[in-house]
């Protein structure tokens, strides 16, 4: 079936190229109650693991650097590949795309990517590098968006969902004012519709409660952008949208009421019991109604232990997402956020995640 989908996608792309129109898309994500569906069918349909249903969950990984580049000539040399001594944005995207089928074969149905990336060091106090698909006036940079389109086209072919973040707190200062933020939101939303993507979940910004410059990206007002995206429709279809908070933070009522699904982060939460508690607390926020709860960032591992954050999320019927970066003195094979990235399943931590993911989902590579 995967081969068939690839052939169909390639044929449709050729027809669309000749005709000058957007290719028909293969993958559609939707929501029913607390579960996700792909092409009208619950994810991991009928699957249970250790007595716990995983049907409708959306296991994922934080892969935010898929279109990374650095426009700051003073810092770009930091990201040189060890084999060439140079940074190469095209190579980064090309290797990302090449790795995607293997992620999918292990049962991973979604990944997060961001128009402004994330810290290329994993965590950073200062972020002088300039990595943004969004120009100061809110327009979209064509080179970044062309790289993103290649990734999203491949995700569509593979039956994968893209959690697309618009803004990141380490780069939002690159936009000159609130009008630029609103323009970027509108243009990114239009870009998705113009290309016919139906496999997208929008994350307005990564961790809205962390040092953003623009007030509309902060917790008190971010729901305005969520609602703005939700109001846009084309051919009777609109995008599914939410935003996230820093590790351990429970979404606020304004975001809970406005969102189609709820994003949690497990960074800083080392006790799996507290991960389960976060899910229960989220369901208790005023305005909550049955929608999916999804962790899309958690830098805790212990995948070989009976209790870990991944397992704890599953126990509360919440989706979970892996966040890994290259730690001090580690080699090129480690992490999916530190630049340059080895996008393969190239380390013990990565293998541990994908091994447990494959066990939980019963997907065979």
Predicted regions span which residues?
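Bacterial N-terminal signal peptides that target proteins for export
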Residues: 1-9
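Boundary at the C-terminal end of the N-terminal hydrophobic targeting segment
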Residues: 20-22
């Amino acid at each position: 079936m995967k081969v068939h989908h690839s052939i169909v996608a390639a044929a449709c792309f050729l027809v669309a190229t000749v005709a000058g129109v957007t290719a028909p898309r293969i993958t559609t994500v939707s929501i029913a109650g607390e579960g996700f569906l792909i092409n009208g069918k619950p994810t991991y349909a009928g699957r249970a693991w250790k007595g716990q249903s995983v049907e409708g969950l959306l296991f994922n990984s934080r892969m935010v650097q898929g279109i990374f580049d650095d426009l700051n000539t003073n810092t770009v040399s930091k990201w040189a590949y060890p084999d060439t001594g140079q940074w190469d944005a095209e190579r980064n995207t090309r290797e990302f795309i090449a790795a995607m089928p293997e992620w999918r074969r292990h049962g991973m149905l979604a990944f997060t990517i961001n128009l402004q990336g994330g810290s290329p060091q994993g965590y950073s106090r200062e972020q002088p590098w300039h990595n943004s698909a969004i120009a100061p006036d809110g327009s979209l940079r064509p080179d970044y968006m062309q790289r993103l389109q290649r990734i999203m086209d491949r995700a569509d072919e593979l039956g994968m969902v893209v959690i697309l973040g618009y803004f990141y707190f380490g780069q939002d200062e690159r936009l000159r004012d609130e009008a630029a933020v609103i323009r970027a939101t509108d243009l990114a939303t239009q870009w998705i519709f113009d290309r016919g993507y139906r496999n997208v979940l929008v994350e307005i910004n990564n961790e809205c409660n962390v040092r953003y410059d623009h007030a509309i990206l902060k917790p008190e007002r971010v729901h305005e952008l969520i609602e703005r995206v939700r109001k846009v429709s084309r051919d009777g279809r609109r995008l599914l949208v939410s935003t996230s908070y820093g590790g351990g933070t429970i979404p606020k009522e304004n975001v809970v009421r406005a969102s189609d699904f709820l994003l949690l982060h497990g960074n800083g939460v080392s006790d799996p019991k507290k991960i389960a508690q976060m899910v229960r607390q989220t369901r208790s926020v005023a305005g909550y109604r049955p929608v999916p709860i999804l962790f899309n960032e958690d830098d805790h591992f212990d995948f070989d232990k009976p209790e870990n954050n991944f397992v704890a999320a599953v126990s509360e019927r919440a989706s979970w997402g892996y966040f890994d970066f290259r730690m001090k003195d580690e080699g090129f094979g480690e992490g999916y956020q530190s630049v340059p990235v080895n996008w393969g399943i190239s380390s013990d931590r990565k293998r541990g995640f994908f091994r447990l993911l494959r066990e939980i989902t019963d997907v065979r590579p």
